[in-house]
Amino acid sequence: MRIITESGDDFRAMPANTKDYAGIKWIADYGSNFKKNIPTTDAVIILNNKHTGKHLCLIEGNFITQARTAATTALATKSILMGDETNRIAFIGCGAQTMPHLQFLLEVIDVKEISLYDKDMSKAYNFA
């Protein structure tokens, strides 16, 4: 399910389930927040027991979202390289996802050089 606002920002419901659990990530994706210098995404995760319906947790979902996205990037990078060597990476955009991506990529690449670019170059300098 997706709700699109008048400004073009959106809310998304991302459900999942297993034999014993049902869960949902509810995420607000507000690209317009970039101009306000506030985070562009905000997420929460709810987990329920499928046998009783009881909620088991309600947790902040931003860290998990960042870690999952960065882990996916690292696994894809490792697969694409298939044993080839590289020691340079570049980030186009230096926001909330940059640090988790660097941390996960360092697990699969022997990084020697990092290039940074952002529309707001002060963000690239601050990250460096």
Q: Where do the protein language model's features map onto the residues?
A:
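NAD(P)-binding Rossmann-fold cofactor-contacting core
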Residues: 107-128
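Active-site-adjacent beta-strand anchor residues
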Residues: 59, 91, 117
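Short glycine/serine- and small hydrophobic-enriched flexible loop segments
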Residues: 75-79
